[in-house]
Amino acid sequence: MLQTQNLQFSYKGSKPLTFPDMHCGKGEQWLLLGQSGSGKTTLLHLLGGLLTPQYGSLKIGDTDITQLKTAALDKFRGQHIGIIFQTPHFVKALTVEENLILAQQLAGVKIDKALVFNILNQLNISHKLKSKPNELSVGEQQRVAIARALINNPSVILADEPTSALDDKNTDEVIQLLENQAAEVGATLLIVTHDGRLKNYFKNQIEIL
């Protein structure tokens, strides 16, 4: 489902970052572990189509996303890749419901308010449907970010440091939530983190040195 080969990326004035080849099957759950400065967030941005590698291939299903032009890549990302950023970003003027509908619109899929409600309900956050993002707690914002990542039934879910600021109890809850929701839609889950506690949760692991 998610395959990379010979990926390489460099920021201007910096030496190239090279990444290990990956092969993550459909529905598998993976941990990508690396310390700060290892390039793990850069890799997440490459996997999500937010950066373009200077070299290498990156396939989701049968599509090499490095070959897609901007508009096609944006549409493909919206329909097939769910990204949960370390710090959630929402359109502040819109409600929770409207932010999720916007994700549907940007992906070019049919607006489905019932689906929006159902996903929020699964995450125990449907009572905040009409709330603005700044009216939510940090934990509630994280759940809405997960809902937004799931709204278009993605093939791949990428989560950036979802537990870095959490205690053990909340870490366990968030990981179970991500695993359960990924399994619900049959998506490949890849968690990118420096949090060594997560080694105990995943049998499939990649470490970036």
Predicted regions and their residues:
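ABC-type ATPase nucleotide-binding domains, specifically the catalytic core motifs of the NBD
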Residues: 12, 101-113, 122
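Helix-to-loop junction immediately C-terminal to a conserved catalytic motif
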Residues: 48
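Conserved ABC transporter NBD signature motif
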Residues: 56-64
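Conserved signature/switch motifs of ABC ATPase nucleotide-binding domains
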Residues: 78, 131-134, 152, 185
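Short coil-to-helix segment of the ABC ATPase nucleotide-binding domain corresponding to the Q-loop/switch region
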Residues: 94-101
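Conserved ABC ATPase signature
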Residues: 132-136, 140-142
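Catalytic Walker B motif of ABC-type/P-loop ATPase nucleotide-binding domains
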Residues: 157-160
